[in-house]
Amino acid sequence: MSGFYHKHFLKLLDFTPAELNSLLQLAAKLKADKKSGKEEAKLTGKNIALIFEKDSTRTRCSFEVAAYDQGARVTYLGPSGSQIGHKESIKDTARVLGRMYDGIQYRGYGQEIVETLAEYAGVPVWNGLTNEFHPTQLLADLLTMQEHLPGKAFNEMTLVYAGDARNNMGNSMLEAAALTGLDLRLVAPQACWPEAALVTECRALAQQNGGNITLTEDVAKGVEGADFIYTDVWVSMGEAKEKWAERIALLRDYQVNSKMMQLTGNPEVKFLHCLPAFHDDQTTLGKKMAEEFGLHGGMEVTDEVFESAASIVFDQAENRMHTIKAVMVATLSKLNN
C-alpha cells in the first residue's frame, strides 16, 4: 500500500489501476479479518471529522463503524452542525479542522468544495459524495462484483447501468471502467448521458486496460450478455413535482424489471443498486410515486427484481463499510504502508 499514506481520496481517476486494485485487496482482507475476529486496530488515537451537507444513512454508518473498528474517534457535523460556506469559508474550515483532526470526510455539493478542503486541510480528505462523483460507492461496487464473479477479471465483466447516467454515479462508473477495463454500458435516453469530454477520456483509458464504454438508448442491445445490471433513483425528495413527471416520462422504459433481466440472456445476471431504492410503496416518496404515476410495482426497479435471488444490493451496502475502512487505513496508518 505504499504511496497511499496522507493521500486524498477525491475521485477514482486520481489513482492508477494498480492502486485501485490494492485498495480492493486491502478491503477484502479487512472484511475477512473482521468476520474471523482477527481485525487489528491501526487507527487508534486518530480523530476523524465527518462533514455531511447532505444526509446519508449508509455513508455515515460506514465511516463511523469503520472508524470505531479501527480504534478511531469521529465527530459528525450534519447539515445544521457546521458553518461551512455560511459563516466560515471552506478554506478557513479546512485549516481549522486540519489542526484538530487526522482525516476529514465530506459529503455534499460541488466537487470544488471537497477539492478546496483537500488543498488547505493538511490532512487526508475523503469524498463521501459530491454532485459530480461518488468514488466510495464504486469501490464497494467493484468489491461486490469481484465477490460474485471470483473467477473473472474486471476486463472480463460486463456492467450495465440503466437510467439517469448524467449524475455522480454515471461519472464515477466511467472512471471505474477506465481503470479496470470493464465492459461498461450506459443504457439511457440521450438526454441522460454524461458529459462527452469525460466519456471520451474514460473510453480511451478503458480500451488501454482491455475494456470498453458504450452509450446506447437501445435497452435490448445494451443489456445483452450483462453480468450485472445497476440502477439508481430517478427522483429525489427535494426536487419539484414538475421534475418528477418529466423524469419518469423520460426514464420509464429504462426500469429494471424481469423483462430487462431476461433480455440479458444470462440466467446468472445480478442486480445492483446504491440505495435507497423506490421498489415499493413503503416509503413516503415511493407511496407518492405509486399514487401519482401508477408506479405501484416499483419505480427505477420493480419489487420483484429487488427482492429476487439476483439482487445483491445488501452485499453491496455492507461493502461500503469495508471499502471505506480500507481508504481510511491506507491513508492514515503508517503501519499499513
From Swiss-Prot:
InterPro entries the record matches: Asp/Orn_carbamoyltranf_P-bd, Asp/Orn_carbamoylTrfase, Asp/Orn_carbamoylTrfase_sf, Asp_carbamoyltransf_Asp/Orn-bd, Orn/put_carbamltrans, OTCase_ArgI
UniProt KW RNA-binding keyword: no
GO BP annotations listed: arginine biosynthetic process via ornithine; citrulline biosynthetic process; L-arginine biosynthetic process
Entry-linked PROSITE patterns: CARBAMOYLTRANSFERASE
UniProt binding sites for L-ornithine: N168, D232, S236, M237
Record's subcellular location: Cytoplasm
Amino acids binding carbamoyl phosphate: S56, T57, R58, T59, Q83, R107, H134, P135, T136, Q137, C274, L275, R320
Gene3D superfamilies the UniProt entry points to: Aspartate/ornithine carbamoyltransferase
Catalytic reaction equation(s): carbamoyl phosphate + L-ornithine = L-citrulline + phosphate + H(+)
Pfam families registered for this protein in UniProt: OTCace, OTCace_N
Gene Ontology terms: cellular component: cytoplasm
Enzyme Commission number: 2.1.3.3
Pathway as given in its UniProt record: Amino-acid biosynthesis; L-arginine biosynthesis; L-arginine from L-ornithine and carbamoyl phosphate: step 1/3
Keywords, alphabetical: Amino-acid biosynthesis, Arginine biosynthesis, Cytoplasm, Transferase
Main EC class the enzyme belongs to: transferase
The keyword Cytoplasm is assigned to this record: yes
GO function term, MF aspect, one: ornithine carbamoyltransferase activity
Record-stated family: Belongs to the aspartate/ornithine carbamoyltransferase superfamily. OTCase family.
Annotated function: Reversibly catalyzes the transfer of the carbamoyl group from carbamoyl phosphate (CP) to the N(epsilon) atom of ornithine (ORN) to produce L-citrulline.
Name of the protein described by the UniProt record: Ornithine carbamoyltransferase
Record lineage: Bacteria, Pseudomonadati, Pseudomonadota, Gammaproteobacteria, Enterobacterales
Gene that produces this protein: argI
